[in-house]
């Protein structure tokens, strides 16, 4: 039995071994086939890799680079290739050992089985990589488009803007569209190029980075071509825009892209071009530059950044970098002239670069003197300035109408860096005939609208105040160049304001001129005989040394429309003014005239007569005004007050009265001065005039206890400026009971002077809806007034002046102020001036502080011990305090570490 059992076991072992040998031989056969398949597959994968690498290298020459997806695929191929190479080495080593002894076969069989499984895994990976390669080939091209690095000139002074833009382009920022705007030549393209290069050199999170250089002629079809070319797309020239848009959309929809559009002139419908609109889900961005903030709005820019002019320091650095010759600028005389040239550029980079290059080889002081003189008088003649002007002309030509272009050119009549009152500017435009009343449209509002267009086009800037505008130096030079037919007819304009002239230009220089502006000089005399057949505009205002106008001065100015003699020292008007039969606008405000000549009535087309602040004006004959049937504006604020002094003598003309004004059918704006209570009572009787009163000065109305302002001024709806002086019995102003929340809605300036019995300003409380347009309040010599708490929530109040009010104890009464800090307190206040307020204890209750005040002037207010500002940890937007040094040093400090905080800037006065 043992023998049989042993035999059975032995047979079973032999049979089992035979079966294992057969299985091992099968594995060996499968492994060899798998190795062959692996070698073929890896070879094919290498070929695909080599083709892709070649394409990347070729596209790299065009400024393109490998996409993140392609880069990951190439990395995976390299890993797979390494694994394959190692496995093939192991297989070949095993093949060399196949002749070894039989006892190793079982071991080899096990190892071959494991090796076969690894081969299968690698083959599977290779298959997946091949599938991914197909997706990469059709995914907007095998490589993704990027901007190539753009060579740019040195960048000066835009570091802060760079940081702002890069922050916007960061992953955390959800807003998708940024509009960068500013005037031509200010550096928008340079900023965009710097951003482009920064992203390329330091890396970014976008799959696709596309730069498109726009122009005025670019349409949506052209944008499609530019974007399509950058994406590597191709299409037939006859293919429709819709099909092209679809291709672009398919190429971009799964990508995170950044589209950079430089110099956009017209609104672009991104979706119509096929570019997906950026949103917080796709995290894409579109950034564009333009010269118009209006276009930023039309394009849906969620973030708008204005590229500002360079500060003086950076402007000097840029200019010097173009001159190159440091030794040249070390000469004090040449440096002084260079600084004049730089100042004329007004921080405009293009002008600085152009003029710096033009002066680089000028070594003598005489050359620099000549350059500064030419730049002052005829800047277009400076080398390179024609290029600067050509760039600005694009913006000029792009204005929507000839009306806008005329209004723009008119702004050049004022001095460099001069802030122009918007309302005054619009009044000139009306006088010139640019604006006319039609269909009930208010011409002043229309003028504001046009100024908004010019500001949006970056051709005008906001002035020193919100109510003002100004024109950049270089833009002004360009405007004068355009006004003279691009320098061809210089004799058409004689514009020399603020030049320091003591003599007027010679008579022959006036003959061909259409426009003459000699304002703000020191001219003492004018030519005796002038023939100006084409002259339409003459500005002589602010020549304080001018005391007389020659008798026949106006005889030969037959088409003159605008004449401004304001703030000269003239004492009389020559009778030759009667020849100005085309005159529309006449300003003699601030002059020393005492009589209006009767001949003024001959100016039948006159619409605007400004005589405000002519305090010496005593006589206005009826015939000087009554014949002016087209008169719309008559301003006698702080002026003539002889309303009830009509004379009927044989040798004396009857004087102007209130009744005469009612016959001026076109009158819309009236400025009135009243110097007696009787006159004030008389004015109350002429109800038809009340709606026209916009400027009112009341003085010396003694026995007037309460001033019923609403009854006099049509509930105050149109009153814009109110001045009350030396009405010693006045206690307060009466406000309408039936207009609790809507009285004096147009009032902008309030002046109260020498009202010794005034205990409060208004008869009832002031809500936020009242006085909603008041900008400036001046109160002086009102010795019974305790506070001005009513001013605290006026939404547009910018300036408060309190002078010599002996009993004022606080600006805001403690019991009339909110119990906690209120952000609506003084929401717009910028300037506070106080002087000679001996009882003033505090400017604000201790729990409050000014948030937006920029200037505080305190003189002789000894009881004030604390500034109404919070200490700040940064120097940004610190207010300036003008005060006595002794008072400044005595200020109370609440915290022992206050010296670590930034206090307001101190300026001794």
Curated annotation (Swiss-Prot):
Changing residue 154 to Y: In strain: cv. Pog-0. InterPro entries: AAA+_ATPase (IPR003593), Apaf_helical (IPR042197), LRR_dom_sf (IPR032675), LRR_R13L4/SHOC2-like (IPR055414), NB-ARC (IPR002182), P-loop_NTPase (IPR027417), Plant_NBS-LRR (IPR050905), WH-like_DNA-bd_sf (IPR036388). Changing residue 653 to V: In strain: cv. BG-4, cv. KNO2, cv. Po-1, cv. Wu-0 and cv. Zu-0. Belongs to the disease resistance NB-LRR family. It is found in: Cytoplasm; Cell membrane. This is Disease resistance protein RPS2. It comes from Arabidopsis thaliana (Mouse-ear cress). The keyword Nucleus does not apply. Changing residue 699 to D: In strain: cv. Yo-0. It holds the Pfam family LRR_14. Changing residue 104 to C: In strain: cv. BG-4, cv. KNO2, cv. Po-1, cv. Wu-0 and cv. Zu-0.
């Amino acid at each position: 039995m043992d023998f049989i059992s042993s035999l059975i076991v032995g047979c079973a072992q032999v049979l089992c071994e035979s079966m294992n040998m057969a299985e091992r031989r099968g594995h060996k056969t499968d492994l060899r086939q798998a190795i062959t398949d692996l070698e073929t597959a890896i070879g094919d994968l290498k070929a695909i890799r080599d083709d892709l690498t070649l394409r990347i290298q070729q596209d790299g020459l065009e400024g393109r680079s490998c996409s993140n997806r392609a880069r990951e695929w190439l990395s995976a191929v390299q890993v797979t290739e390494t694994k394959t190479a190692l496995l093939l080495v192991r297989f070949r080593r095993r093949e060399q050992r196949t002749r070894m002894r039989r006892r190793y076969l079982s071991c080899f069989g096990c190892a071959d089985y494991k090796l076969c499984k690894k081969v299968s895994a690698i083959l599977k990976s290779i298959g997946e990589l091949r599938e991914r390669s197909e997706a990469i080939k059709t995914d907007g091209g095998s490589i993704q488009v990027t901007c190539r690095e753009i060579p740019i000139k040195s960048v000066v002074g835009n570091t802060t803007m760079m940081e702002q833009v890069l922050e916007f382009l960061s992953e955390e920022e959800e807003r998708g569209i940024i509009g960068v705007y500013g005037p031509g030549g200010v550096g928008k393209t340079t900023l965009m190029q710097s951003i482009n290069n920064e992203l390329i050199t330091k890396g970014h999170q976008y799959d696709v980075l596309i730069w498109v250089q726009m122009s005025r002629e670019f349409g949506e079809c052209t944008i499609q071509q530019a974007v399509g070319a950058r994406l590597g797309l191709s299409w037939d020239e006859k293919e429709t825009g819709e099909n092209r848009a679809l291709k672009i959309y398919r190429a971009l929809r799964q990508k995170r892209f950044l589209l950079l559009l430089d110099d956009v002139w017209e609104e672009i419908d991104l979706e119509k071009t096929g570019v997906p609109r950026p949103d917080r889900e796709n995290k894409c961005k579109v950034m564009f530059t333009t010269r118009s903030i209006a276009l930023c709005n039309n394009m849906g820019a969620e973030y708008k950044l204005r590229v500002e002019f360079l500060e003086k320091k950076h402007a000097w650095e840029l200019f010097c970098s173009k001159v190159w010759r440091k030794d040249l600028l070390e000469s004090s005389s040449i440096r002084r002239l260079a600084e004049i040239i730089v100042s004329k550029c007004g921080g405009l980079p293009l002008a600085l670069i152009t003029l710096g290059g033009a002066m680089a080889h000028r070594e003598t002081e005489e050359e620099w003197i000549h350059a500064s003189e030419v730049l002052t008088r005829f800047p277009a003649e400076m080398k390179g300035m024609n290029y600067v002007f050509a760039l600005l002309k694009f913006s000029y030509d792009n204005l929507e109408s000839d009306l806008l272009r005329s209004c723009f050119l008119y702004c050049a009549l004022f001095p460099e860096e001069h802030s122009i009152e918007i309302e005054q500017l619009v009044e000139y435009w009306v006088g010139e005939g640019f604006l006319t009343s039609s269909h009930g449209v208010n011409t002043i509002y229309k003028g504001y609208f046009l100024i908004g267009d010019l500001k949006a086009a970056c051709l005008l800037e906001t002035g020193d105040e919100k109510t003002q505008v100004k024109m950049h130096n270089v833009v002004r030079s360009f405007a004068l160049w355009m006004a003279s037919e691009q320098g061809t007819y210089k004799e058409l304009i004689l514009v020399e304001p603020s030049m320091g002239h003591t003599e007027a230009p010679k008579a022959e220089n006036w003959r061909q001129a259409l426009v003459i502006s000699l304002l703000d000089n020191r001219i003492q005399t004018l030519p005796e005989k002038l023939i100006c057949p084409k002259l339409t505009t003459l500005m002589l205002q602010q020549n304080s040394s001018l005391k007389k106008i020659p008798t026949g001065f106006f005889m030969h100015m037959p088409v003159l429309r605008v004449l401004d003699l304001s703030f000269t020292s003239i004492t009389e008007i020559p009778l030759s003014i009667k020849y100005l039969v085309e005159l529309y606008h006449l300003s003699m405000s601030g002059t020393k005239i005492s009589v209006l000549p009767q001949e003024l009535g001959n100016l039948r087309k006159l619409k605007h007569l400004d005589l405000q602040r002519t305090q010496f004006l005593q006589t206005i004959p009826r015939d000087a005004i009554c014949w002016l049937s087209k008169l719309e504006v008559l301003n006698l604020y702080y002026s003539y007050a002889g309303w009830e002094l009509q004379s009927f003598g044989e040798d004396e003309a009857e004087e102007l009265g209130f009744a005469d004004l009612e016959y001026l059918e076109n009158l819309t704006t009236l400025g009135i001065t009243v110097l007696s209570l009787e006159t004030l009572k008389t004015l109350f009787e002429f109800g038809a005039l009340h709606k026209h009163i916009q400027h009112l000065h009341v003085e010396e109305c003694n026995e007037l206890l309460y001033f019923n302002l609403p009854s006099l001024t049509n509930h105050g709806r149109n009153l814009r400026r109110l001045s009350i002086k030396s009405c010693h019995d006045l206690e307060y102003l009466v406000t309408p009971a039936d207009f609790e929340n809507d009285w004096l809605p147009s009032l902008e300036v309030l002046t109260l002077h020498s009202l010794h019995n005034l205990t409060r300003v208004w008869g009832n409380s002031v809500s936020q809806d009242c006085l909603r347009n008041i900008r400036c309040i001046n109160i002086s010599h009102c010795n019974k007034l305790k506070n001005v708490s009513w001013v605290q929530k006026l939404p547009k109040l910018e300036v408060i002046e309190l002078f010599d009010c002996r009993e004022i104890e606080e600006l805001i009464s403690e019991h009339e102020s909110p119990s906690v800090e209120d952000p609506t307190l003084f929401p717009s206040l910028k300037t506070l001036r106080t002087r000679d307020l001996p009882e003033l204890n505090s400017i604000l209750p201790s729990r409050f502080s000014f948030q937006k005040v920029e200037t505080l002037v305190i003189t002789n207010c000894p009881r004030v011990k604390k500034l109404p500002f919070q200490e700040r940890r940064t120097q940004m937007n610190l207010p300036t305090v003008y005060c006595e040094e002794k008072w400044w040093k005595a200020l109370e400090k609440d915290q022992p570490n206050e010296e670590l905080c930034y206090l307001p800037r101190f300026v001794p006065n």
